[in-house]
Structure formats: C-alpha cells, structure tokens
C-alpha cells in the first residue's frame, strides 16, 4: 500500500473548523457611537477596534484611534480606508446611504439600537455582544448595568431642571420634550423645566424666567463653549431664576448624560444626589 504525505496547509485546512474563530482571523472593527464603542471595549474587543467616530471618547484608549468623523455626517471613503471587516454602528448614524455603500463593499455592518432611555442600554449591549460572539460576557455586563441602574432612587422630587445645550458659535438651546436630556431628568425623578415643545429651542429671557428652573444642568463641553461656568448665569434671564439666585448648577460628561451607555447609571446618580441635596 502506498502512503501519501499530506502537506501542512492541507492538514491545517482540515483542522480549521475545530479552531476558535479568533484563532483564524481577528476582526478589524470600526465603531460608530460613543455608547457602541464603550460597550465594545467593555466586552474585550479593544484590540480589534481600528477606528472610531468623534463621539467615542471613552474609554481613553479609544482616543488614540483614528477618528472617522461625526456619526451624523459619515463618509464612506474615510471608513473604508481603515479596511474594516465589521462596522458596529448606532442606528442614529447618518447618512444611511453611506452605510449601504459600506455594506456593499463586503463589510459586515451591524446596526445597534439607538433608543434614548436608560432601559434601552441592555438592548445595545445584547446587540454588540451578539456581533462579537460574546453573549456570555454580554449577559454579565447587562446584569451589572441593570443592578447599577436599579440602585438609583427614581421617586419623583419637586425639582424643575433646565438643560442647556451649548456648542461653539451656536446660540445656547433649551431642551424640551422628546430629548435625551428630558429622558434623563425624568429618569432621575425630576421634571423638565421647559414644557410645551419638543426637541430644542433657543434660550429666551421670557422663556427662561417663566420656566423657573430650580437647577441648571449642562455638559462639560457646554461650559467650555460658554468660556466658564460663571458665564452660564449671564445667559438670558438665567440670573432671575431660582437656579440662578442660588447658583445651583450641575456639570456632567456629555456622552454620559446624552449617549445612554454604560455610564448612564453614574450620571443619573449624580443628578439624583444634587436634587436630593436641594430638599
């Protein structure tokens, strides 16, 4: 009987189905959305992430990666230049045509839910964990998140909170209903000082005074845009409100407040503590 020598590549090809996926080929992942990036890192995919969008500032390791731009003005060429095998992208990302172009190039485009409620974060974790084949880690992360969220007291308090959004060169805006800020204020047990409109409106002296906020909420980037925290009280009508008279101000991280990611329970606890101190 004649024996044939099998080549090493042939032997390895037979064994390939038995090897773990990550042994065969590592993914090259681009993450779009601060919440998505944060979750992907928490699930241990940091070594496979090759680029991220400008809203992805956490963890700090993400800041060292190439930035493919703002999630609502994506460019296909910039993303494809990173040679990704997978795009983990928030469903809030735009334009959708770019995502279609990327998918048609052979990239696995995974859309992550973008709902703006604290409870929706579990859905985001599940979507990312499934894409990364880390469902067990994902379940543990969901359980940890839900425990931290449940620890925040959500009993209603008689505190009216005004959230001001400020970006360099733009008129400061007040958050109305159907905004991420409104959802966070209500989730912490407060009430939105601005009523009667959805989304955002420019601040007006009459509107601010009439809303009579007890507490002013703003992000760290908002303070930078205004120059300093003291400049907040120079905004139209602000000094004449209960918040202005008592200098009641809470400054929080932008993505932690508005991104609905892993840090949501932490910023809710900050807001809740500040409101309880006012009682």
Curated annotation (Swiss-Prot):
Domain Fe/B12 periplasmic-binding residues, every copy: 28-279
Keywords from the UniProt entry: Ion transport, Iron, Iron transport, Periplasm, Signal, Transport
Main location class: periplasm
Domain of life of the organism encoding this protein: Bacteria
InterPro entries membership: ABC_Transporter_SBP, ABC_transptr_periplasmic_BD
Gene3D superfamilies hit by this protein: Nitrogenase molybdenum iron protein domain
GO biological process: iron ion transport
Pfam family, any one: Peripla_BP_2
Localization per Swiss-Prot or TrEMBL: Periplasm
Signal peptide feature range: 1-25
Listed GO CC annotations: periplasmic space
Presence of the UniProt keyword Nucleus in the record: no
Membrane-spanning residues: none
Main function: Part of the binding-protein-dependent transport system for hemin.
Protein name: Hemin-binding periplasmic protein HmuT
Organism annotation: Yersinia pestis
Gene: hmuT
